Amino acid sequence: MSTEGPSLASSPAISPLAFLSAPVTPGTLAEATDPLPMLIALACIFLLLATCLLFMTLCKPAALDPSRRRAHECMPHHPGSPSEPQLRLWKRLGSLRLSLHSFRHGRPTVPRQPLPGPEDNRSHCDYMESTKM
């Protein structure tokens, strides 16, 4: 009977970085040479960079535009502004939205007039007399 605990030789301690120095078996070698995950990762990185480049070229953020070092309005009112076509586009889209809304709900109806009360009886008679000949 031994009074000491389990020996370290019988149960090796697993290091957090043990997978880096683990011997390569034939099964893991095939997984390591599979290029599909690497190609997917490269494609995602490429798409992310291309999207950023496209945004920078098309939208031209004010922080990157050297001609706009001074303070400026968000919605310029001068006609030579490059953002005016976008404003026209938003107006057209708003008009389209309103026309689709009115098409779905039909034409607006004329608000109904309340029925004439006893105090309106005289004006109703005047109206009837003016139409009779």
UniProtKB/Swiss-Prot annotation:
Keywords: Membrane, Transmembrane, Transmembrane helix. Coiled coil: none annotated. Its main location: membrane. Residues 119-133 have a biased composition (Basic and acidic residues). It is a single-pass membrane protein. The chain crosses the membrane at residues 36-56. Residues 105-133 are annotated as: Disordered. GO terms for cellular component: membrane. InterPro entries: DUF5527. Pfam families: DUF5527 (PF17665). This is Uncharacterized protein C10orf105. It comes from Homo sapiens (Human). The lineage of its organism: Eukaryota, Metazoa, Chordata, Craniata, Vertebrata.
